[in-house]
A protein has these predicted regions:
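Bacterial N-terminal signal peptides
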Residues: 11-23
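Bacterial N-terminal signal peptides that target proteins for export
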Residues: 2-12
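Acidic, low-complexity Ser/Thr/Gly/Pro-rich repeat segments typical of extracellular/periplasmic
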Residues: 27-141
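Generic secretory/membrane-interface signal
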Residues: 4, 17, 42-44
Length: 141
C-alpha cells in the first residue's frame, strides 16, 4: 500500500512539473493572448440607457488595428442607426461608433463573431467575440 502511494505521489509531482514547464515554455501571459473587450459604454446588460447618447464605445485590452472592425448585427431591428464611420481614439484601444438610438428599444451587437473577425490588434490577432446588449429607456429622465 505504501509503495503504491509513493508511486502515485511521484506521478502527481511529475505531472505537475510537466504542466509548469509546458506553461512556461509556451510563455503564457497577457501580451501574447488575443485582445478582449475590457469595457463598453453603455455596459452590456444595461437597462434604461438614455436614448439621447450619440455614441457607443468599446475598449479593448490592447492597441487595435485602425480601420478594422466588425460591428455585427443579428437583426436590423436590434442594430442602431449609424451616423458616420467608426473610429479609434488616440489610445488605439477605444473604438467609437456614432449612433442614433430610439427610446424603449433593445440593441444587440456582436463585436466580432466566429465568421467576422475584423476587430484585430496591431499584430493581426482577432479579438475574442463579445456580445453587447442593452435597452434604452423612454428618454424622460
Amino acid at each position: 500500500m505504501r509503495m503504491k502511494l509513493t508511486v502515485y505521489l511521484r506521478c502527481i509531482v511529475a505531472l505537475a512539473a510537466v504542466f509548469i514547464i509546458t506553461g512556461s515554455a509556451l510563455g503564457l501571459n497577457l501580451e501574447n493572448q488575443p485582445p478582449v473587450v475590457v469595457g463598453t459604454v453603455p455596459e452590456s446588460g444595461a437597462k434604461n440607457v438614455d436614448p439621447a447618447i450619440r455614441e457607443i464605445r468599446v475598449t479593448f485590452s490592447t492597441k487595435m488595428m485602425d480601420k478594422s472592425w466588425s460591428w455585427v448585427q443579428i437583426a436590423p431591428e436590434n442594430f442602431p442607426d449609424l451616423v458616420g464611420e467608426p473610429r479609434y481614439l488616440e489610445d488605439k484601444k477605444t473604438c467609437i461608433l456614432k449612433v442614433r438610438l430610439e427610446p424603449e428599444k433593445t440593441y444587440i451587437i456582436w463585436l466580432n463573431t466566429q465568421r467576422y473577425t475584423n476587430f484585430k490588434d496591431t499584430d493581426g490577432r482577432p479579438a475574442q467575440p463579445y456580445l453587447l446588449m442593452f435597452e434604452t429607456g423612454n428618454g424622460k429622465f
